[in-house]
Swiss-Prot record:
A Gene Ontology term for the protein's cellular component: extracellular region
Keyword Cytoplasm carried by entry: no
Protein name: Small cardioactive peptides
Role this protein plays: The cardioactive peptides enhance the contractions of the auricle in vitro.
Signal peptide: 1-24
Propeptide: 47-136
Keywords: Amidation, Neuropeptide, Secreted, Signal
Transmembrane segments: none
Organism: Lymnaea stagnalis
Entry similarity comment: Belongs to the SCP family.
Primary residence: secreted
Positions of modified residues (Methionine amide): 33, 44
GO BP annotations, alphabetical order: neuropeptide signaling pathway
Subcellular location as annotated: Secreted
Length: 136
């Protein structure tokens, strides 16, 4: 068997292809091991940036929870806001304040009856559905 330049170059090319394919399989098969991100899926976790809520985009709160007012066991008061701090309910919605069984006060935006008469949505139905979701 004679060693010639074409045979050596072909053997080296095949060897290079095999090494590259084996190396790439590790990245494609196990994307979170080693250098995650190279030829793999993006990081699947929480973003470092705050997501845009409906209040940030439209300047008002849509149907649903607007704020929660909690009093901790140590007496510390905390307000959790789902919308912007000073955002009002969107047009056609009114703000309703209520209290959960555990003593947490919350405000939510529900359809206004006078505005919703043009549609088939009743404010009391939406309010009861949202309230039942909160109690779960």
């Amino acid at each position: 068997m004679e060693i010639t330049l074409p045979r050596v170059s072909l053997s080296l090319a095949v060897l290079l292809v095999i090494v590259c394919s084996v190396d790439a399989q590790n990245y494609l098969a196990f994307p979170r091991m080693g250098r995650s991100g190279y030829l793999a899926f993006p990081r699947m976790g929480r973003s470092h940036f705050k997501s845009e809520t409906s209040a940030d985009v439209t300047g008002c709160c849509g149907v649903g929870i607007k704020n929660e007012f909690l009093i901790g066991q140590d007496g510390k008061e905390e307000i959790r806001s789902a919308c912007g701090a000073r955002a009002d309910c969107c047009e056609g919605l009114k703000e309703v304040v209520d209290q959960k069984n555990d003593g947490v006060y919350f405000s939510m935006c529900v359809p206004d009856i006078t505005f919703a008469q043009a549609s088939s949505v009743r404010s009391s139905e939406v309010f009861n559905k949202l309230k039942s979701l909160l109690e779960k």
